[in-house]
From Swiss-Prot:
This is Small ribosomal subunit protein uS17. Part of the 30S ribosomal subunit. Belongs to the universal ribosomal protein uS17 family. GO terms for molecular function: rRNA binding; structural constituent of ribosome. It holds the Pfam family Ribosomal_S17. It comes from the Bacteria. GO terms for cellular component: cytosolic small ribosomal subunit. The keyword rRNA-binding applies. GO terms for biological process: translation. PROSITE patterns: RIBOSOMAL_S17. One of the primary rRNA binding proteins, it binds specifically to the 5'-end of 16S ribosomal RNA. Coiled coil: none annotated.
Length: 86
C-alpha cells in the first residue's frame, strides 16, 4: 500500500498517559438507512507520538502505518490545534 493511500483521520486527544502513545477520539457521521437522519458515532485509535508532543484536548491528524504494537496502527502526523488551558 502506498503512503498516500493510507487512511488519515483528524481527532481529539483523550489520553496521553502512555509513553510515546496517544489515544485519539475520531468522530464521524453516518446516515441512517431507514430514516435518513445523520447519526454521530466515534472510535478511539492509539497512535504513535515519538516526541510526546501532543497533550489532552489537542486536535491532531493521524495516519495509518504498519503495526507498531498489538493496538497501535497509526502515527501522529501533525498537531492541527493545541488545547486551550483555562
Amino acid at each position: 500500500m502506498e503512503r498516500n493511500q493510507r487512511k488519515v483521520y483528524t481527532g481529539r486527544v483523550v489520553s496521553d498517559k502512555m509513553d510515546k502513545t496517544i489515544t485519539v477520539l475520531v468522530e464521524t457521521y453516518k446516515k441512517d438507512r431507514l430514516y435518513g437522519k445523520r447519526v454521530k458515532y466515534s472510535k478511539k485509535f492509539k497512535a504513535h507520538d515519538e516526541n510526546n508532543s501532543a497533550k489532552i484536548g489537542d486536535i491532531v491528524r493521524i495516519q495509518e502505518t504498519r503495526p507498531l504494537s498489538k493496538d497501535k496502527h497509526f502515527r501522529l502526523v501533525e498537531i492541527v490545534e493545541e488545547a486551550v488551558i483555562i
